[in-house]
């Protein structure tokens, strides 16, 4: 059976990973394509 500490560590690691994935997605999406938008 999984303990409370193991569940807390797993959920924290999963949350940090998903947060960094969203940040990386937005960073990549904002900095690719649309080269004319930066000229304004």
From Swiss-Prot:
Location of this chain's protein in the cell: Endoplasmic reticulum membrane
GO biological process, one term: protein N-linked glycosylation
Topological domain ranges for the Cytoplasmic compartment: 26-40
Top-level taxonomic group: Eukaryota
A Pfam family the protein falls into: Ost4
Membrane topology: Single-pass type III membrane protein
Record's GO cellular component terms: oligosaccharyltransferase complex
Spans within the Lumenal topological domain: 1-4
Keyword Iron-sulfur recorded: no
Annotated keywords: Endoplasmic reticulum, Membrane, Signal-anchor, Transmembrane, Transmembrane helix
Transmembrane segments: 5-25
Known role: Subunit of the oligosaccharyl transferase (OST) complex that catalyzes the initial transfer of a defined glycan (Glc(3)Man(9)GlcNAc(2) in eukaryotes) from the lipid carrier dolichol-pyrophosphate to an asparagine residue within an Asn-X-Ser/Thr consensus motif in nascent polypeptide chains, the first step in protein N-glycosylation. N-glycosylation occurs cotranslationally and the complex associates with the Sec61 complex at the channel-forming translocon complex that mediates protein translocation across the endoplasmic reticulum (ER). All subunits are required for a maximal enzyme activity.
Complex formation: Component of the oligosaccharyltransferase (OST) complex.
Family of the protein in this entry: Belongs to the OST4 family.
Protein's name in the database: Dolichyl-diphosphooligosaccharide--protein glycosyltransferase subunit 4
Organism for this UniProt entry: Drosophila yakuba (Fruit fly)
């Amino acid at each position: 059976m999984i303990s409370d500490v193991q569940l807390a560590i797993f959920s924290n690691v999963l949350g940090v990973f998903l947060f960094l994935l969203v940040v990386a997605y937005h960073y990549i999406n904002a900095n690719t394509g649309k080269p004319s938008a930066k000229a304004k």
